[in-house]
Amino acid sequence: SKSSTETPLSYNQLNYKENLQRFFNSKPVTAPTQLDPVNRDSSYASTSREDACSAISPDHGGECSGGSGSSGNCTTNSNIRMSSFTNTSITGTGTSGCGNSGGKLSESGPVEVGGAAADAGPSLAADNSIPPISVTLTESLLN
């Protein structure tokens, strides 16, 4: 007789392939759609992400007025709380304007950001553009 130290296979182990095939053929519902956190309110989450992206996009719409050597007024159409740049300098060093340039300032002097006067103006990057903003959306912000 032949001896073995292995445990004999059970009925379920012997029929694993058939059981697996029968499971997938029955097309089970593993997670109901209304309880799936990813798809629970996808239209809202998608809209919120698009709104957030458009709010921090440097290519936002805007209106500007002002010319060479004058103070320029730029109003953005974004949802960021900082809604306008107003250059109050009388002695300009170039033309003022924003358009879709991301709110670049080309004149020196005090700058009002959202109505609060600042002596040195906003902190700008080396190329005189507004530095990128990093926003992390968490689930608590989307609810």
Swiss-Prot record:
Q: Where is this region: Disordered?
A: 25-130
Q: What kind of modification does the protein receive after translation?
A: Phosphorylated with a circadian rhythmicity, probably by the double-time protein (dbt). Phosphorylation could be implicated in the stability of per monomer and in the formation of heterodimer per-tim.
Q: Which GO terms describe its cellular component?
A: nucleus; perinuclear region of cytoplasm
Q: Where in or outside the cell is it found?
A: Nucleus; Cytoplasm, Perinuclear region
Coiled-coil stretches, from where to where?
Answer: none
Domain of life per record: Eukaryota
Picking any one GO biological process from the record gives:
rhythmic process
Low complexity bias located where?
71-93, 114-126
Q: Which UniProt keywords apply?
A: Biological rhythms, Cytoplasm, Nucleus, Phosphoprotein, Repeat
Entry keyword annotation includes Cytoplasm? yes
Oligomeric state and interaction partners are given as: Forms a heterodimer with timeless (TIM); the complex then translocates into the nucleus.
Role played: Essential for biological clock functions. Determines the period length of circadian and ultradian rhythms; an increase in PER dosage leads to shortened circadian rhythms and a decrease leads to lengthened circadian rhythms. Essential for the circadian rhythmicity of locomotor activity, eclosion behavior, and for the rhythmic component of the male courtship song that originates in the thoracic nervous system. The biological cycle depends on the rhythmic formation and nuclear localization of the TIM-PER complex. Light induces the degradation of TIM, which promotes elimination of PER.
User: Can you say what this protein is called?
Assistant: Period circadian protein
Q: What is the source species?
A: Drosophila picticornis (Fruit fly)
Q: Which gene encodes it?
A: per
